Amino acid sequence: MESQRNILLIGLLFVSFLMWQQWQTDKAPKPATAQTVTQTNAASQHSADVPEADISGVPVELPANKNLISVKTDQLDIKISPIGGDIVYAALVEHKREIDSSDPFVILEQKNNFTYIAQSGLIGRDGIDSSANGRAAYSVQTNSYSLADGKDTLTVPFTYTADNGVTYVKSFTFTRGQYDVGVDYSISNTSAAPLQVQMYGQIKQTIKESESSMMMPTYRGGAFSAQDTRYEKYNFDDMADKNLAKVTLGGWAAMLQHYFVSAWVPPATDSNTIFSSMSAGGMANIGFRGAVYDIAPGATQEINSQFYVGPKNQKELSAISETLNLVVDYGFLWWLAIPIHWLLMFYQSFVGNWGVAIILITLTVRGGLYPLTKKQYTSMAKMRNLQPKLTEMKERFGDDRQKMGQAMMELYKKEKVNPMGGCLPILLQMPIFIALYWVLLESYELRHAPFMLWITDLSVQDPYYVLPLLMGLSMFLMQKMQPVAPTMDPMQVKMMQWMPVIFTVFFLWFPAGLVLYWLVGNLVAITQQKIIYAGLEKNGIK
C-alpha cells in the first residue's frame, strides 16, 4: 500500500512542479510592440545608442561589411565597426549552431530586422561619442587580425585624432582560450585645455522571445549586478516600464539567453552607473556608465573595461567577476544544484562521457539514500503483514472513517510501524531530481553532449522516444512488484494504473539526460527492492 501511495506522491509532486514551472513560463515577458514602447518611453524615445547623462543618443552607424574589422582567435570570430568601435558580430568557433552543422554559433549580429551588438565609447563634456557630433571614426592598420600560433594574446588598436589634436587609442585585447575581451582606452591630452570624459558600454538587442517550452523553460533578457543586488534579472518588460539607473561600485550588465551570455564588466574599484533603456521600435539597451576622468594638459589617461561574449562557463565567469557566474541560474535549489554540477563535472573528467557521468550521479544518489530506502521497504513489508488486521477493521467499522483512523493509529503504535516511513526517501529524492533538472537545463557543457547510439545530445529530448518508453516500462514493473492493498481507495488504484502512462507522456519532451537519470534510478530501485525483500524474508518478514 505504501509503495503505491509513494508512487502517487511522486506523481503529485512532479505534476505540481510542472504546473509551477509552466506558471513561471506564462509570466515571462512577451516581446513589446513598437507602439507599446513608444507609449511607455515617450520621454526617452531618443535613447538609442550613446548614453549621455540624460541617456539620449543617435542612431547606429554601420559601415558596409567589407569595411568591418575582422578578428579571429581560437575561440572567437569577431567583427568590429571602425565607427565607434562597436562589436557588431561575434561567433563562437568551438560551439556549433546545430549539432549536425559546421557553422559556428553566432551571438552578436545585425541582419534583417534583428540587432544584437555591443557598443562602447567616450561620453561626457569632451567625449568623442555624442548625440550631437556622432561617433568617432577610427583608423586601423589592417582590416583583418588573427591570433598567431604560439602567441597567447592579440591586441587590436583603433586610433582616432580629434580636431584639437588629442589622440584616442581604443584597444581590444584577446586571450587564447578565453571569451573575455579587454576594451581599453588610452587618451593622450596634447591640447592646452583639460579634458573630461566618461566611458560607457552597453549591449543593444532587438526584443526577441525566448525559445522556451513547458519542459525546457529558458530566459532571454537583461541582468545586472550591483553592491546591494548580487544578481537580478531585468527583462524586456522591465526595461520598457522603467529605465534602470543604479549607482554602484563595480557591478556588471548583461544580456542572457539559453547557455550563452554577453556582459560588460567595468572596473570593480570604480563608481559606475548600471543603466537600461528602451528605444522606439523595440530595441533594448543595458549597460554601464563609468567613472568621470579629468585629464590635465600633457597627461595620459588609461580607462579599462572587460566584455564577455560566450558560453555560461562558471569558472571563467567567476574569474572576471565574483558574481558573474550567477547568470547560470539554478533556481531556488541552487545550493543543491551547485554540488550536483561539480560532481557531474568530476565524473565526466574521468569517464569522458556525460551520459555515463549521469549514470554515476544516479548511483551516487541512490547509494546515499539506500539506508532510508531500506527503512522504507521494511516499513512497507510490516504494513503488508498488518493487512489482515486492517481488512478486519474495515469490515468492522464500515464507513465510519473516524473510528477506523483511530483504530489504525493504535495498531501502528502497538506494532511500532510508521505509516509515513516510506515517504522520506521520496521527499528527499524530489529536490535532487529538480536540482538535476536545472543543472541539465542550464549547464552549457551538456549542449550537444552525446551519450551513445542514437542519443547524440543529452540536453534535448530523445528523438526516437526510446528512453521515455523504457522509463515508463520500468515504472510499470515497479508498480507490479507491489500488491495493491485491499484498504486502498479505488480512485487511488485507478490513478496508480495510469501513472506510468502519464509519466511517459510527460517525459517524452524532457531532456534525454534527465530521462536517463530517472530510468537508471528506477532500475536501481527495482534491484534494491529485490535485495532488501530477500533479506527481510530471511528474517521472517514478508
Curated annotation (Swiss-Prot):
Pfam families: 60KD_IMP, YidC_periplas. Its main location: membrane. One of its GO terms (molecular function) is membrane insertase activity. It comes from the Bacteria. It is a multi-pass membrane protein. One of its GO terms (cellular component) is plasma membrane. One of its GO terms (biological process) is protein transport. The chain crosses the membrane at residues 6-26, 326-346, 350-370, 421-441, 458-478, 501-521. Disulfide bonds: none annotated. Keywords: Cell inner membrane, Cell membrane, Chaperone, Membrane, Protein transport, Transmembrane, Transmembrane helix, Transport. It is found in: Cell inner membrane. Belongs to the OXA1/ALB3/YidC family. Type 1 subfamily. Interacts with the Sec translocase complex via SecD. Specifically interacts with transmembrane segments of nascent integral membrane proteins during membrane integration. Required for the insertion and/or proper folding and/or complex formation of integral membrane proteins into the membrane. Involved in integration of membrane proteins that insert both dependently and independently of the Sec translocase complex, as well as at least some lipoproteins. Aids folding of multispanning membrane proteins. This is Membrane protein insertase YidC. It comes from Shewanella frigidimarina (strain NCIMB 400).
